[in-house]
Regions:
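Short helix-to-coil transition segments within interhelical loops
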Residues: 26, 350-353, 359-368, 444, ...
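C-terminal membrane-exit region of the final transmembrane helix in multipass inner-membrane proteins
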Residues: 421-454
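Mid-to-C-terminal secondary-structure elements
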Residues: 138-152, 163-317
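Short, strongly hydrophobic transmembrane alpha-helices
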Residues: 28-62
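A hydrophobic alpha-helix feature that marks transmembrane segments and, especially
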Residues: 51, 330-357, 370, 437
Length: 454
C-alpha cells in the first residue's frame, strides 16, 4: 500500500515538474505558443460547429424505439418504370389499405399530408390554412406522440369515419389560448370536428414518419391530424408527394375514384414489429402479398418488396443534407491543415531547445523523460487551445443560422458532450502533432550538443 502511494506521489511530482517546465517554455516563446493555441482553437471549433450540425441532422429521431419501426415497400410500378430496381417509397391506395386491413403487425399506420382551412368555433379568429396529416389511429401510440390534453381516437372512430381531430399545442394556443380544448369543435374545410386530443410540443427531427411524402423533413410540424378514413371519405386530396408511373391509368386522374384505383403512390406506411421473428414473418407476408398480386394479374413481374428500419430508411431517403456532410468534411480538412502547421511550429519550438536537451541528457535524463516532458508541454498547449476552442465554438453556434438552413441550425445544440469533445479534440490533436517533433528532440545527442556549445 505504502509502495503504491509512494509511486503515485512520485508520478504526481514528476507531472508537476513537467508542467512547470512547459510553463517556463511557453513564457520564453510567447509568440509561437500563442500561434499554436490559436491554430488548435480555430481547428477544433470549426470541426465542432460542423459536427454539431451534422449530429443534429443525422441523429436517430426515436432511439428508444427505432429498432421496432419499419417501412414496407411494394413495387407496383414494375422493372420498366421503377428507379434502378427499387420499389416506390410510397404505397398506392390499394396496397396501403390491404396492408392496414391485414393487421399482420403489432401496429400499422397509414399517413398522407393535406392542407386544411381551419375556422375556430368563435368569431375572434380568422380562417387560416394549416398543414395536417391524415393518419390511422395507431399513429400516436406507434410514434409515442406526447399529449398535453386528451389522446388519440379509437379504432372504432376509424371504422366510423368519425369527425374527430388531434391538434398541435401551437394551434391550440392560437385558437384557445393554450386552454384544455378537448371536447370543443373547430371547422375544417367547412365540416365540424370534435377535438379529442392536444399534442404537447412535439416535432421529431427529422420528421421521419412522413419523410417520403414531404419535400423537407426538417420543416415545421403538422398542426392537425384527422382519421385517414375520414379524409378518404371526404375526397381530401394529398398535398405531398404523388408518384405515378407511365403505366398508371389516366395520368391526370380526373376524379377521386380514379386516384383510389390508380397505381399512383402517395401514402406512407409504417409497421411496428417488436421482435426479430416478427420482422421475418412480416417480410414473408409482404412477399406473399406481392406474389398474390402477380397471380391475379395485377403485376406481371416477380415480387419486389422491401422492409426498412428507421436508420436504413433515413439513408435511403438521403435525409442528411449534403451541405452539413460537406461542411464536416471541409472542417476536418481545415483541422488537418492546422495540424500540419502545428507540427512545423512545434518542431521549431523543440529544436531551438536542443542545447537544453543535451544538458539534461548529459545529466542522466533518459529519452523517455524527454518524451514525457515535451508531450506534457504539447498537452498543456492543446488544453489552452481547447479552452479557446470552447469560446469560438460558442460564438460559432450563435451565427450558425447564417451558414446552414435555419430549420437544421436550430437543432444544433451546445451541450456538455460537445464542450468535452471540443477540449478532447484539441488536446488529442496537439499530442498527435507533437509526436514527430518530440521524436526529433529525443534524438539529440548530448555529447555533440555539449561539444558544439563548448
Amino acid at each position: 500500500m505504502s509502495r503504491a502511494f509512494r509511486a503515485a506521489a512520485r508520478g504526481a511530482s514528476l507531472l508537476t515538474y513537467y508542467f512547470d517546465l512547459a510553463w517556463r517554455s511557453c513564457r520564453r516563446s510567447k509568440a509561437l505558443t500563442a500561434l499554436v493555441v490559436l491554430l488548435m482553437g480555430c481547428g477544433a471549433a470549426t470541426c465542432m460547429v460542423s459536427f454539431a450540425v451534422f449530429r443534429a441532422a443525422a441523429a436517430d429521431p426515436i432511439p428508444w424505439k427505432s429498432q421496432q419501426l419499419f417501412v414496407p415497400q411494394i413495387d407496383n410500378f414494375g422493372p420498366a418504370h421503377n428507379w434502378k430496381g427499387e420499389p416506390p417509397t410510397l404505397l398506392s391506395y390499394t396496397d396501403a389499405v390491404a396492408l392496414l386491413q391485414a393487421r399482420q403487425a403489432r401496429r400499422q399506420v397509414l399517413i398522407y399530408g393535406s392542407k386544411w382551412t381551419v375556422l375556430p368555433g368563435d368569431a375572434q379568429h380568422l380562417p387560416s390554412s394549416q398543414e395536417g396529416d391524415a393518419v390511422s389511429h395507431d399513429f400516436f401510440a406507434m410514434f409515442d406522440a406526447p399529449f398535453r390534453y386528451g389522446g388519440g381516437w379509437s379504432a372504432s372512430d376509424d371504422e366510423q369515419r368519425a369527425a374527430v381531430v388531434v391538434i398541435s399545442s401551437a394551434l391550440n394556443r392560437k385558437l384557445f389560448g393554450g386552454a384544455n380544448s378537448v371536447g370543443r369543435e373547430i371547422e375544417l374545410d367547412a365540416h365540424a370536428y370534435r377535438i379529442v386530443g392536444v399534442l404537447d410540443d412535439w416535432n421529431p427531427s427529422p420528421r421521419f414518419f412522413d419523410v417520403s411524402s414531404t419535400w423537407y423533413p426538417f420543416s415545421r410540424p403538422r398542426q392537425l391530424y384527422v382519421p385517414f378514413s375520414r379524409a378518404i371519405d371526404l375526397h381530401k386530396a394529398a398535398s405531398t408527394n404523388f408518384y405515378c408511373s407511365t403505366n398508371s391509368v389516366d395520368p391526370y386522374l380526373p376524379n377521386w375514384d380514379s386516384i383510389l384505383h390508380s397505381e399512383c403512390a402517395w401514402i406512407a406506411a409504417w409497421v411496428e414489429l417488436p421482435r426479430r421473428a416478427d420482422v421475418e414473418r412480416y417480410r414473408d407476408w409482404l412477399h406473399n402479398y406481392a406474389a398474390e398480386q402477380q397471380r391475379v394479374g395485377r403485376f406481371d413481374w416477380p415480387p419486389n418488396v422491401r422492409l426498412s428500419g428507421v436508420g436504413q430508411w433515413l439513408q435511403i431517403m438521403k435525409v442528411v443534407p449534403k451541405s452539413s456532410a460537406l461542411s464536416l468534411i471541409v472542417s476536418v480538412s481545415f483541422l488537418l491543415i492546422c495540424l500540419v502547421n502545428v507540427v512545423g511550429l512545434m518542431l521549431a519550438r523543440f529544436m531551438r531547445r536542443a542545447p537544453e536537451i543535451g544538458v539534461r541528457r548529459a545529466l542522466g535524463a533518459s529519452r523517455g523523460a524527454i518524451y514525457r516532458q515535451f508531450l506534457t508541454e504539447a498537452a498543456a498547449i492543446g488544453l489552452a487551445g481547447g479552452v479557446l476552442g470552447l469560446l469560438l465554438t460558442a460564438l460559432g453556434m450563435v451565427g450558425i443560422g447564417k451558414v446552414f438552413e435555419p430549420e437544421i441550425a436550430r437543432l444544433a445544440t451546445l451541450d456538455a458532450s460537445l464542450l468535452l469533445l471540443t477540449v478532447l479534440v484539441a488536446v488529442t490533436a496537439s499530442l498527435v502533432a507533437a509526436l514527430y517533433p518530440t521524436w526529433r528532440a529525443a534524438q539529440v545527442q548530448p555529447a555533440w550538443q555539449l561539444k558544439s556549445n563548448g
